[in-house]
A protein has these predicted regions:
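HAD-like aspartate-dependent phosphatase fold
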Residues: 1-120
């Protein structure tokens, strides 16, 4: 099985700047469903956050993941901030949708999941 790394803010949930407000982050459902599908398929998932490795942030993030059923094998903090990070783009990536409710690309994960299913 493969190893996958997911960013937290902007990928699994709306961005959060204050741990006191972390519980208000909206989940990006398609991304969470895709991540959970990968876990259930036996893949190793790391969630890597730009959030600081501070006890308050760690606890708030773990609670949020538990609340929304986000499955993962490893949770990391202090990810460097980068404007763009591209790695192993999915086939037909130009055919993604846009989730207007949370302002994030979300339907891309459905296309990726379809591509992964065709590799079997």
């Amino acid at each position: 099985m493969s190893n996958y790394v997911f960013a937290m803010d902007g990928v699994l949930c709306t961005p959060c700047d204050d741990f006191m407000e972390a519980h208000n982050c909206k989940p990006i459902i398609n991304a969470i469903e895709f991540l959970n599908w990968l876990v259930k398929e036996g893949h190793h998932i790391t969630v890597w956050c730009e959030r600081p490795n501070d006890l308050s942030w760690v606890m708030a993030t773990r609670e949020w993941c538990s609340k929304y059923g986000v499955l993962y094998n490893r949770l990391l903090f202090d990810k460097p901030k980068m404007p763009t990070f591209v790695n192993e783009t999915p086939c037909n990536a130009s055919n993604y949708g846009y989730d207007h409710d949370v302002g994030e690309v979300a339907l891309l994960f459905e296309e990726w999941k379809k591509c992964q299913n065709t590799k079997e």
